[in-house]
Amino acid sequence: MSDSKEPSVQQLGLLEEEQLRGLGFRQTRGYKSLAGCLGHGALVLQLLSFTLLAGLLIQVSKFPSSISQEQSKQDAIYQNLTQLKAAVGEFSEKSKLQEIYQELTQLKAAVGELPEKSKQQEIYQELTRLKAAVGELPEKSKQQEIYQELTRLKAAVGELPEKSKQQEIYQELTRLKAAVGELPEKSKQQEIYQELTRLKAAVGELPEKSKQQEIYQELTRLKAAVGELPEKSKQQEIYQELTRLKAAVGELPEKSKQQEIYQELTRLKAAVGELPEKSKQQEIYQELTQLKAAVERLCRPCPWEWTFFQGNCYFMSNSQRDWHDSVTACQEVGAQLVVIKSAEEQNFLQLQSSRSNRFAWMGLSDLNQEGTWQWVDGSPLSPSFKQYWNRGEPNNVGEEDCAEFSGNGWNDDKCNLAKFWICKKSAASCSRDEEQFLSPAPATPNPPPV
C-alpha cells in the first residue's frame, strides 16, 4: 500500500510543477507547493492590516484631546493680552509718570525725617482716625473743598522751619493740652470761693478741737486746687487757641460726632473765659495763707493725721507690717499698739477699721501662754470683751497668736503676717488762752510748707 501511494504523490508534484512553469512562475525555495505559499501569505496580510488599523485608532483618539488643549491655551493667552492692553491703556502720558515719580521721591525724603517709632505710631493712629472721618464726608462738592484746604495746608507745611522748630511747636501744643485738662470747672471755682467764706466764719467762731483738724485738712486741699490754676497770660493763650480750634471745627461738615466736639469746645471756651482774673486769684491765695497760719496757732490735742476720741489720739497706718514691727512703730512715736479699755472705744475703733476695709493689728496676743490673751501693757483680756471675737475665733489654726480687727469683730492670725496697725496715745492738754488763737495772722509772701 505504501508503495502505491508514493508514486501518486510524486506524480502530483510533477503535475503542479509543470502547471506553474506554464504560467510563468518559479518554485520558491522553502515552499513545496502553491497551496502552502498562498496559505502563509494570507496570514501575513491579516497581521499587517490589524497593526495599521490599531495605529490609526490610537492617532484618531489623541487628535480631539490635543485640539482642546491647544484651544484652552489660546484662550488663556488671549485673556492675558486683553488685560495687558487694558492696563497699558490706563497709563497716563509720560509727563504724568514723571510727576508721580517726583512726588514719590519727595515723600521718601519726608519719611526719612520722621521722628522716633513711638511718634510714628501716634501719627499712624491719628491718620487712621482721619481716614475714618473722611469716609463719613458728604457730597463730592464738599470733598473738593476739603481737598483744596488740604492742598493749602500742604503748601503751608512745606514752608515750616527746620525740624527743631516743629518739635518745639509740638511740645507747646502738648503743654497746652495738659494745661486745659487741669482747668477746674466753673462750679468747682464757685465751690472753692464759698468754702473759703464758710471757713473764715468757722475759724472766727473757734469750733471744737476735732473740727479744727477737719478745717486744716480742707484748707490744704483747697490750697492745692488753687495752686493748679494757670496764670493770666497762660489763660489768654489757652483762650486764643480754643478760639482757633472752634473756628476750625466750625468748618467741618454737619455730622453728629463733629457737632459733639464743637459743643465740647464751646463749653471749654466758656469755662476758660470765666476764670477769675489774676488779682482775684492772689486775693484767694492770701486769704488761704492767713487762714492756715491762724489754724496752725490753734491748740491741737492730737498731731495731724491722728484722730481724737474721748481724751486719746489714734493713728491708722497707711502701710503694713507684722505684729512685732507694728508694736515698735507705735513706740517710736510715743504711743503703743492700741489697748482697748471700754465698749465705746471698741465700737469707735471697729467702725474706723470697717470703713477703711482694712485688717489692722491691735495690741492683743497670747504669745506668753497659749489661750491666755494679754494686752501689750500687760493687762489681761476682760471676759466681757470675748463677745467681740468673730464666730469660731480664736481658733489658733497654724499658731495664730496675734489679734486683729477683721470685718465686724476680732480674729486671731499669724503674727508674722503684714497688716495695717493702730496706735494709741493720750491727747495733749491745751492751757493757753483761747483769745490768743483768734489773733489775725500776718500776711506772708510765701506759703508755709504743707
Curated annotation (Swiss-Prot):
Disulfide bonds join 302-313, 330-423, 402-415. A motif (Endocytosis signal) lies at residues 14-15, 16-18, 31-34. Coiled coil: none annotated. It is a single-pass type II membrane protein. Gene3D superfamilies: Mannose-Binding Protein A, subunit A (3.10.100.10). One of its GO terms (cellular component) is membrane. Residues 59-450 are extracellular. The keyword Disulfide bond applies. Its main location: membrane. InterPro entries: C-type_lectin-like, C-type_lectin-like/link_sf, C-type_lectin/snaclec_domain, C-type_lectin_CS, CD209-like_CTLD, CTDL_fold. Residues 309-424 form the C-type lectin domain. Ca(2+) binds at residues 393, 395, 397, 400, 411-412. GO terms for biological process: adaptive immune response; cell adhesion; endocytosis; innate immune response. Pathogen-recognition receptor expressed on the surface of immature dendritic cells (DCs) and involved in initiation of primary immune response. Thought to mediate the endocytosis of pathogens which are subsequently degraded in lysosomal compartments. The receptor returns to the cell membrane surface and the pathogen-derived antigens are presented to resting T-cells via MHC class II proteins to initiate the adaptive immune response. Probably recognizes in a calcium-dependent manner high mannose N-linked oligosaccharides in a variety of pathogen antigens. On DCs it is a high affinity receptor for ICAM2 and ICAM3 by binding to mannose-like carbohydrates. May act as a DC rolling receptor that mediates transendothelial migration of DC presursors from blood to tissues by binding endothelial ICAM2. Seems to regulate DC-induced T-cell proliferation by binding to ICAM3 on T-cells in the immunological synapse formed between DC and T-cells. The tandem repeat domain, also called neck domain, mediates oligomerization. PANTHER family: MANNOSE, PHOSPHOLIPASE, LECTIN RECEPTOR RELATED. This is CD209 antigen. It comes from Hylobates lar.
